Amino acid sequence: MFYPDPFDVIVIGGGHAGTEAAMASARMGQQTLLLTHNIDTLGQMSCNPAIGGIGKGHLVKEIDAMGGLMARAVDQAGIQFRILNSSKGPAVRATRAQADRVLYRQAIRTALENQPNLTIFQQAVDDLIVENDRVVGAVTQMGLKFRAKAVVLTVGTFLDGKIHIGLDNYSGGRAGDPPSIPLARRLRELPLRVNRLKTGTPPRIDARTIDFSVLAQQHGDNPMPVFSFLGNASQHPAQMPCYITHTNEKTHDVIRNNLDRSPMYAGIIEGIGPRYCPSIEDKVMRFADRNTHQIFLEPEGLTSNEIYPNGISTSLPFDVQWQIVRSMTGMENARIVRPGYAIEYDFFDPRDLKPTLENKFVHGLFFAGQINGTTGYEEAAAQGMLAGLNAARLAADKEGWSPRRDQAYLGVLVDDLCTLGTKEPYRMFTSRAEYRLMLREDNADLRLTEIGRELGMVDDHRWARFNEKLESIEKERQRLRDIHIHPQSELLDQVNSLLKTPLSREANGEELLRRPEVDYVQLTALPLFAPGLTDEQAAEQVEIQVKYEGYIARQQDEIEKQLRNENTLLPADLDYKQVNGLSNEVIAKLNDHKPSSIGQASRISGITPAAISILLIWLKKQGLLRRSA
């Protein structure tokens, strides 16, 4: 039978991608259905109990800037907050939080259940209803049919998932959850390129069996950071430390002596695992010269005795896992409460997607998360938000939207996936972005909140706070520009106390702040420049904008140049052997990829800026230089 009520958008899957997709669609006013196999696992943290990190924290801030959920949830659930790379420049600073799994899940579920236009229904999905190359609904395992104008698939590792522990394996979506086999078979019938990937998780340890007294502690930052632009530290629950131990030669001997029992090294697992989160057996073999690896013992929650040993993801047999754990300092008597495992699953080539994350071959069908070949909660959530908002726009007969590479890390993520594809689980890093100085955590709202408002994602409260912040920044910068001090001033000694080189000419507040030895708090502590802003976010923006103004202007010039490249079209039938000066490697790659524009060509691995310059000169000489409108 068909469900009595029609929907505009159906989201299949209630993980990090699915919850953001459902929230985005519902916030935009579309009647949205979230189908999940288990309502109790909405927002489940399937692997590590943490949000954020290098590149990942940037994505969380971008989700928040557009009204998304993840940052608000982790502010309510985080039990240790830190700023990574705090001693480096603002472009690469990143927020990370350990999270209480239960509190995080509760925060997500509460938000979903209180979101207007959103219906949650518990049933696994076995089939899609496709008519004339257009998806029009979904069918659950009990045969119940739902109709919708768009469907978002956020099925994580569940598509034909297979769990491996040693040489044994069984079907599963993750530990304790069934796989989605009928839906995987249905998707393989569609004209889509499918392959397999693998990821893994470490064993969980009973905290009561660890000797923490011999381990180094790691505490969070004080004052505590927050993730959401609307958040504050008073929302955080009680805080907990992490602990650090290390593998050793005994650990590595155990692993090397049992590689024949590893499903990866025995050839049982065919899927490729994440390069930047390798298993402990991979670490030992790939970095054979290292006799130790750092392992972080991370609490899973305020009321849980489970510890997540970050750094020993493994699919070795349980008896080997037991030996590995007990070989490390402080863990000599440790007990495993959940074994580590690897999981293989289907993913679909993201080059078959539009930048809106709509499938090129099945109209109205959107993919987000691990189904696109990514790894990580944050990458999934960001894609989910984008897919959800574009599904809502399609349902409303509006054009889709996708951020550019210079606008957001989400733009980098989507462009990398849709242009280059991936053969291994894709993880976000700041190094993937060309315009890191523009794509900072601290300015995610300045980049995206106005766009989110135009799209219908940002509510009145966030919009009002955003405009107050903008006004504060501009007024404060103008105030500093209007305050001058000259070498004859009686206040000169106060100012010179901050400077490495005494003031020799008249200067205003911004010029003083631009000096590397002067920070905003010091400057506004001087009577002449007091009082400073009490809004810490606005004050941070004033300092960064002033200090990095020249660098930001240069990067903006680069962006404008790159935008010209994006609009410079390449002939579809061009044989790059004709272009004098290109290396054989570059010619082969360009002929293989057939990029549609100079911008796309520039992002192909191995295509250098010099090659792009040669290509532009050749196009101009041949009279083939064309730009899109």
UniProtKB/Swiss-Prot annotation:
Tell me the InterPro entries matching this sequence: FAD/NAD-bd_sf, GIDA_C_N, MnmG, MnmG-rel, MnmG-rel_CS, MnmG_C, MnmG_C_subdom, MnmG_C_subdom_sf
Q: Which residues form a coiled coil?
A: none
Biological role: NAD-binding protein involved in the addition of a carboxymethylaminomethyl (cmnm) group at the wobble position (U34) of certain tRNAs, forming tRNA-cmnm(5)s(2)U34.
Q: What organism does the UniProt record list as the source?
A: Pectobacterium carotovorum subsp. carotovorum (strain PC1)
Entry's localization field: Cytoplasm
Q: Which GO terms describe its cellular component?
A: cytosol
Q: Which amino acids does the record list as binding FAD?
A: 13-18, 125, 180, 370
Superkingdom of source: Bacteria
Q: Which cofactor does it need?
A: FAD
**Similarity comment text for this entry:** Belongs to the MnmG family.
Question: What HAMAP family does UniProt report for this protein, alphabetically?
Answer: MnmG_GidA
Q: Which amino acid positions bind NAD(+), per UniProt?
A: 273-287
Q: Does the keyword Cytoplasm apply?
A: yes
Put simply, this protein is called tRNA uridine 5-carboxymethylaminomethyl modification enzyme MnmG
